[in-house]
Amino acid sequence: MLVAVALLELHIPHAQSLKDKRAVVRSVRDRLRNLDLSAKEVALQDLHQRARMAVAFVALDNAAADSVLEKVRELVESVPDAMLTGWTSEKLDFDETAPLT
C-alpha cells in the first residue's frame, strides 16, 4: 500500500484579487476531489497570483500511484486559468500486513 502526496505550485496570471485566486483554486480543488483525491491549498494564501496545493491519496501499488499522479498533473495542466509552475511528489510505502500497535 502506498500513500502518495503531490505538491504543486500554480501561477494565476489573470487574478486581480484574492477572490479571483480563490475561485481558480476552488475549481482545481473540486476537479481533483471528483477523482476522489484529497486536495488543499497549503501555502501562499496571501499572494493573489500564486497558489501552492497538496494532493494526497492511497494506492495499492506503484503503478497505480504513478497513473493517478499523471492524471493529477494532466488535470492541473488543463485548467485554463492557471499555469503549473512547480511540481514534486513522493510515495510512502506501507506494509499493510504488518501487525498494528
Language-model regions, residue ranges each:
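Flexible hinge/switch segments at interdomain interfaces of large molecular machines
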Residues: 1-2, 46
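Short glycine-/aliphatic-rich beta-strand segments at the starts of folded cytosolic domains
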Residues: 3-14, 18
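Hydrophobic residues positioned within well-ordered beta-strands of beta-sheet architectures
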Residues: 4-8, 51-53, 85
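Ordered, soluble secondary-structure elements with a strong preference for glycine-centered loop motifs
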Residues: 15-23, 62-66
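Short amphipathic alpha-helix segments
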Residues: 19-38
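Short beta-strand elements
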Residues: 35-43, 83-90
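Short, charge-patterned binding micro-sites
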Residues: 39-61
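C-terminal structural segments of small proteins and small subunits
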Residues: 59-101
